[in-house]
Amino acid sequence: LLNRIDEPATGRVLDPMFHADIPAGRLAQAKAAGSILGEQVWRQFPWIGCSHGEAGQAHAMPTTTDPVEGILARTWRPALSVTGAAGFPSIDSAGNVLRPKTTFKLSLRLPPTVDGELATQRLKALLEADPPYNARVSFNADWGATGWDAPETAPWLARAADDASRAAFGRPAAWMGEGGTIPFMNMLGARFPRAQFLTTGVLGPRSNAHGPNEFLHIDC
């Protein structure tokens, strides 16, 4: 069933409905950011490595080490994750028996211009249609949210960002999207279609709004 959603060898999501055309401006921003960050785009993550044998220095690798492709994969390409599972016995009680049912919790990241509700309906149809071996398959969605693609940056805001970046870092500002949904931004964008947005927040140590290590570390 999961192979209906993505390729098991590459992780590429198959259905065109989950994809979106990448705007030329966003592609240019990703190229500029990639040229600055280089391998930091993927080396910043704690890759698991082996500590024994001939492959003692080997570690897991991302699907791409190209900085630009890494940025686009996080922001403008869909990706499927299995975030939970139920119905499997623990190892100490597992036996050679059939399970009555198996449950997976899935997370499908979408490009910001893909409609979250329509994508949820499509995902349900893909998983429930023609079950293999006459199995019973059911899909229940928690929620499907549409991402947010910020409007084109006004010249005055771009100048302000460049001035601030030059004052702090000696270089003009660079732009890079982030692969996460903040539904409130869509609400604000719909309510104020001509507004410019500068969305930021500084969270101190251990604030951890959504995860165990979510805060900004700012060198002073």
Can you describe what each PLM-predicted range is?
Residues 76, 98-102, 171-220:
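Zn-dependent metallopeptidase/amidohydrolase metal-coordination segment
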Residues 3, 9-10, 152-195:
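Active-site-adjacent substrate-binding region
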Residues 82, 136-141, 173-175:
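Generic structural signal for residues in well-ordered beta-strands
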